[in-house]
Amino acid sequence: MEKLLIVNADDFGLCKGQNYGIIEAFRHGIVSSTTAMMNCAEIYHAAELSKQNPALPVGMHFVLTYGRPLTAMQSLVDAKGELGKWLWARAEAGELNLDEIAQELTAQFNKFVAVFGRPPTHVDSHHHVHMLPQIYPLIESFAHEKSLPLRIDRHEAQQQGMVLNSPRSTEWFDAGFYGENLTEQSFLQLLAKADQNGINTIEVMCHPAFIDKILMTSGYCYPRLTELEILTSPALKQSIEQLGYRLGSYSDC
């Protein structure tokens, strides 16, 4: 049986270095999908690159922890009007305003359609905020309403005791291709683990990029360049084919 591998590059639109890295890894490597951050300054640059590379499937990377929201989100922004990683503390304290989050989700979706000229192929989120138990039902309902596939971290859902109402997704999502010690072998190990568990559709997350000034301020900077080098390796692509995987997108789910 043919197996589906989605190699999704997160953070399309974050900055030009990220945008160019994703396109490089798509054109000359194994990246087969990407997701766009609609509240970032370089989203229009990303959209222009998308027009030049129409075969690249583009989904939406819902953002609640970076930059400025598109709508008024008084419950989540700081004094500067910016979002941040304090979302988790507010979630634990039961202080999330789900009406504001739903409004922002709709605004980011509508902007995606306006900027890219089509709906996203699927939805995921920056820092996996859509897998928070308080937020997930809202996202799942929105995905069903729009007939969109959704990235599902099934391990996280199981750990949190979350109820999944048959979202359209892959059998497995792996965030393991991330960190300081990345190699081609570490990527292949993720696929070997999926094989051992009888999984036939898997998404692997990645963040390939060329380094620019914006990424220099990120806590995850130079490994993005390492990711780019690995993801454009001809040997890795050949190994994936030999393992019986076909590169694809959420449109194939």
UniProtKB/Swiss-Prot annotation:
UniProt EC number: 3.5.1.105
A Pfam family of this chain: YdjC
GO cellular component: cytoplasm
Subcellular compartments: Cytoplasm
Cofactors demanded by this protein: Mg(2+)
Pathway noted in the entry: Glycan degradation; chitin degradation
GO molecular function per UniProt: chitin disaccharide deacetylase activity; deacetylase activity; metal ion binding
The entry's keywords: Carbohydrate metabolism, Chitin degradation, Cytoplasm, Hydrolase, Magnesium, Metal-binding, Polysaccharide degradation
Binding locations of Mg(2+): H61, H126
Family to which the UniProt record says this protein belongs: Belongs to the YdjC deacetylase family. ChbG subfamily.
Quaternary structure and partners: Homodimer.
Protein name (record): Chitooligosaccharide deacetylase
Lineage of the organism: Bacteria, Pseudomonadati, Pseudomonadota, Gammaproteobacteria, Enterobacterales
Primary gene name: chbG
